[in-house]
Regions:
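Active-site loop/helix belt of alpha/beta enzymes
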Residues: 1-102, 165, 191-193, 202
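Charged (often Lys/Glu-rich) extended helix/loop segments that serve as interaction or gating elements
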Residues: 60, 74-235
Length: 235
């Protein structure tokens, strides 16, 4: 269907196409479809998007399907959806430590963090937009405008452009919201960066579910050819 959809019209239009195929298959071949996958793509909140409830998408779809099955005299197929991102995106956030700060007068202020495109490539890859705050100073007024940049040697390693935050200081904790989807799953070891840990948090309890990679992990699959070992031993 697509991604980040906030309107149910495309789903209803697609369902009509699918129901036409269900009808044709039944009449031409005598086969009744037992399962329909209605897809996913339900929108989530990254910044200020108003996220519709699942019922907004599914209630009209199910009503149309029920009416179709009644008209056709057939049992309603099992319905499958793919909620994916809409379940996990807002359930996750990324925590970074602020490092160096560079204020280019009249241009912009850069606040660097100890992560970036290696753990969340979406802003660099296709301009995804996120919201963040200084977690250790969340009650302070956001009087500063800064561009949050990563640690990679890439000018495009930007997490958030023109973020409104309190004046950042080295050591501050930056929280970036709605990174539960396509963050860890798209992480890489670019620039020989270890992938960070994943921690499950619920009701004041925290449990490690993916440990932080070490540099030893990055080298674990490296193999030194025998010819190079001989050259090394000779010296």
């Amino acid at each position: 269907m697509g991604s980040q959809l906030f309107d149910n019209a495309p789903y209803l239009a697609a369902l009509e196409v699918v129901l036409g195929l269900v009808r044709e298959v039944r009449r031409r071949f005598g086969h009744t479809v037992a399962e329909l996958n209605l897809g996913g793509g339900f929108g989530v909140t990254y910044t200020d998007e108003a996220r519709p409830p699942y019922a907004y998408f599914l209630d009209p779809l199910m009503a149309r399907l029920e009416a179709f099955c009644q008209d056709e005299g057939m049992t309603r197929p099992a319905v499958v959806i793919e909620p994916g991102r809409s379940i996990v995106a807002e359930a996750g956030l990324s925590l970074y430590t602020v490092g160096s700060i560079k204020d280019i007068r009249g241009v912009r202020k850069y606040v660097s963090v100890d992560g970036g495109m290696t753990d969340n490539i979406r802003p660099s890859l296709y301009g995804a937009v996120y919201r963040g705050l200084l977690a250790n100073r969340a009650e302070e007024a956001s009087t500063d405008t800064a561009t949050i940049c990563g640690k990679c040697c890439e000018s495009g390693d930007i997490l958030i452009r023109d973020a409104r935050i309190p004046p950042a200081r080295p050591g501050d904790l930056l929280a970036v919201f709605s990174t539960g989807a396509y963050g860890f799953s798209m992480a890489s070891n670019y620039n020989s960066s270890p992938i960070p840990a994943v921690v499950l948090v619920k009701e004041g309890r925290s449990e490690l579910i993916v440990r932080r990679q070490s540099y030893a992990d990055l080298l674990a699959t490296a193999v030194i050819p025998e010819s190079l070992q001989c050259a090394r031993d000779a010296h």
